[in-house]
């Protein structure tokens, strides 16, 4: 049994370098919701040094709301924005002796792509046209995963240790009760159940089947680093191999 651990980095949380000792895939903010050129370069350099798979973390252009405000934009504008962000991170990765291996949208773009086919298609098209060898990280069971697979991209299905789930496999919106799981012991138990049992309990009590291929560990919060280590240690103690998905090649030269 195996699993990938990923984290969203370059967002100003201050623990990026240390988190890269614990995760196997890094989703690096591309400047539109957080971060910037220097943060991107730092994260890429550390990821290359530590052999962590490099991923782009594009978003809507929304630094005021950390990329979490949903937007109604033309598909062509979404396509261009994703392409722009991929190009920026790819240039930095190439200069640092690495390459982008995957793409995981951020925030509202991630959530809207999971449920809105037009947005999913725009994001997938940008990724495919930029580099069809790139893998896509998307919410397990979502329409975004389906769209990526239909376009011929490798799709890696993602689950969250600290987010509440609805019965249809979607995440509880952050504005609603049950959206966030705060208890670390509960998060740890949920993670092990998602990886070993391939299921998660919804906020309404049902078991929801999931194809857990990568687990997102959020890097913000005062205890994020210690908790990330707890999760990694628990997975390895359970005999689960922790490494990047086979489709990704960490630290490869462009």
Swiss-Prot record:
SUPFAM superfamilies named among the record's database cross-references: Glycoside hydrolase/deacetylase
Alphabetical keyword list: ATP-binding, Hydrolase, Nucleotide-binding
Example GO biological process: carbohydrate metabolic process
Catalysed transformations (reactions): 5-oxo-L-proline + ATP + 2 H2O = L-glutamate + ADP + phosphate + H(+)
GO molecular function: 5-oxoprolinase (ATP-hydrolyzing) activity; ATP binding
Pfam family name, one: LamB_YcsF
Transmembrane regions: none
Entry annotated with the keyword Oxidoreductase: no
The protein's Enzyme Commission number: 3.5.2.9
Subunit description: Forms a complex composed of PxpA, PxpB and PxpC.
Family: Belongs to the LamB/PxpA family.
Annotated function: Catalyzes the cleavage of 5-oxoproline to form L-glutamate coupled to the hydrolysis of ATP to ADP and inorganic phosphate.
PANTHER family named in the record: 5-OXOPROLINASE SUBUNIT A, UNCHARACTERIZED PROTEIN YBGL-RELATED
Protein name, entry field: 5-oxoprolinase subunit A
Originating gene: pxpA
């Amino acid at each position: 049994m195996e699993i990938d651990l990923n984290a969203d980095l370059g967002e100003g949380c201050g623990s990026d370098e240390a988190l890269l000792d614990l995760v196997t895939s890094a989703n690096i903010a591309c400047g539109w919701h957080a971060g910037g050129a220097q943060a991107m370069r730092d994260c890429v350099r550390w990821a290359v040094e530590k052999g962590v798979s490099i991923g782009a973390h594009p978003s809507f252009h929304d630094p005021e709301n950390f990329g979490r405000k949903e937007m109604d934009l033309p598909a062509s504008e979404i396509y261009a924005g994703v392409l722009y962000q991929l190009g920026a991170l790819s240039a930095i990765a190439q200069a640092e002796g690495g390459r982008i291996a995957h793409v995981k949208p951020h925030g509202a773009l991630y959530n809207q792509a999971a449920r809105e086919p037009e947005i999913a298609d725009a994001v997938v098209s940008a990724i495919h046209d930029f580099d069809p060898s790139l893998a896509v990280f998307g919410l397990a069971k979502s329409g975004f995963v389906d769209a990526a697979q239909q376009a011929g991209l490798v799709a890696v299905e993602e689950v969250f240790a600290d987010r509440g789930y609805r019965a249809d496999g979607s995440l509880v919106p952050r504005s609603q009760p049950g959206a966030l799981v705060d208890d670390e012991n509960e998060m740890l138990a949920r993670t092990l159940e998602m990886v070993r049992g391939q299921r998660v309990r919804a906020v309404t009590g049902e078991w929801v089947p999931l194809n857990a291929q990568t687990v997102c560990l959020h890097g913000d919060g005062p205890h994020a680093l210690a908790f990330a280590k707890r999760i990694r240690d628990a997975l390895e103690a359970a005999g689960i191999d922790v490494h990047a998905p086979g489709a990704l090649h960490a630290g490869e030269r462009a």
